[in-house]
Amino acid sequence: MNTWKRYIGGIALILGLAVLPHCGFGETSAVPEVRGIVLTGEAKQDYIKTQMDALYAPPEDKEPVPFTAPEGWGYEKISIGNVPVERLAPPKPSSNQVVLQLHGGAYMSGLTDLYRTFAVRQAEYTNAREIYCVEYRHAPIHRYPAALEDAATVYQGLLARRTKPSDIIIYGDSAGGNLAVELAIYLRDEGLPQPAALILLSPWADFAHKDGTSRTENFTKDKVLGKGTPFAPHLRSIPPYAGGLPLDDPRLSPIHADLSGLPPMLIQTGSYDLLLTEDEVLAAKAAADGTPVTLSIYPEMPHVFPLVLPELAESFAAFEEVREFVNQYMTP
């Protein structure tokens, strides 16, 4: 049976891939119907490689097609405190929940259609009435703390719009996962109310490259960040967003930060993820600091797999886990 490891409050459990946990230990929800493409072994890795080659291929020389939201959805480009934001809203929301999306891209790239499409799924599985995608400033022009300032501005703007903090979910992947944790730390230190939950997909938790970790052990396995990808030549470089800060500064690398007093975290990663080790360290640090945390490791899956491989069964399972996590921690 495929398994992944989960940490809840520092307690590790091994669960089957088809079984999603309920909110109590020793209980499980019914085995859900398997959805998505099911692949194993070499067939799965070959498929992932093919999909990533297509994703990273140079764009065709033709006029890009503007993003179109699904039928019935609201979609608008707005500004909150001078920060560009894109707002998506499903046609028939059944809750007051709001998602603040912090996109990935190594703090080097802006919002793309990949993330707009991802936002639709994020809204669906979190039962959100609206989702705000933040177009924060990024390197190399803008360095720390530009992205954090923009994320904090939008969060406080949502509060000013009378959005309850208990209705807010911060959802970040990769660099956006880093930003989500750093935003929560900033809110705590400034005495501002915390969101209800943090959902972190393959968060970038350590700016320093360390040999002998998944950064090297998964280099040939991770088809999203590893060998043969556009990111591979830069993995040992100093991230431009760091500016003049040491790479182990807790403002850059949350594995070195005080993680007490933060909202419940769901950390999802893959056993082939280049950032697996630091995600494990982040989960252990959060648990040690008293923050409720769940770490799920999906077998043989790469970095940010639900974002770039949404059609696979593991991605459907990851989104179902998000749904259950949100149901557990959001106030009815």
PLM features: residue spans?
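N-terminal Sec-pathway targeting helices
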Residues: 1-11
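Bacterial N-terminal signal peptides
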Residues: 11-19
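Bacterial Sec-dependent signal peptides at the C-terminal "C-region" and cleavage site
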Residues: 19-29
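Alpha/beta-hydrolase superfamily serine-hydrolase fold, recognizing
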Residues: 30-51, 55, 59-332
